[in-house]
Amino acid sequence: METDTSRTDTDLPFFHPKPTPARPLQGLTILAVEDSRFASEALRLLCLRSGARIRRADCLASAHRHLRTYRPSVAVVDLGLPDGSGLSLIREMNRAAHRVPVVLATSGAEREAAARTALEAGADGFLPKPVDTLAAFQSEILRHLPEDMRPQGPRPLDATVLEPDRLALREDLAHAIALLDRDAPPMGYLRRFL
């Protein structure tokens, strides 16, 4: 993957809000590479409450299109995607001339093994699915951000558990059923997806 842009969204000459204790991710753009609508909705709510903008890619091809256009502040990459492994994208981003500042992997299956494999591929950290609380989401991102991108002073730890829209879960289940109805359903992908 070649990234021909060396700028992050925060390099643009517009006004960029600074992080605050209440909105510690304000001013950041998070690229969520996630095929599950339910998990994407959860990430959207976490970003919204944290002050971050979110862009979504539901597959590797879409993620590559995003990365050719801009460099996000943070990338959250699901390891099991319909058109390949998120590990390959993590490796590509890790080798890029202008690396995304924070790359986190996410998976709901075999968490310890997935985390170890993702870190070996070059991820900075790992977010298990589902993310337990708003504080856990914010803390994992802030832990890996460069000092100059973090909010100054103490910040409240919000233990709020955000509930994504149940309609998104129904859509994910309908998608899985449709895949099972194929002549040759992609069982490996379905195991990771569900």
PLM regions and their residue ranges:
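Active-site beta3 strand of CheY-like receiver
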Residues: 70-81
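Short amphipathic alpha-helix used as the core "switch/output" element in two-component signaling
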Residues: 87-99
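C-terminal output/effector regions of signal-responsive regulators
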Residues: 154-194
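Non-catalytic signal-transmission and effector/linker regions of two-component phosphorelay proteins
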Residues: 1-31, 35, 154-160
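Alpha4 helix (beta4-alpha4-beta5 surface) of REC/receiver domains from two-component response regulators
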Residues: 88, 109-127, 135-139, 143
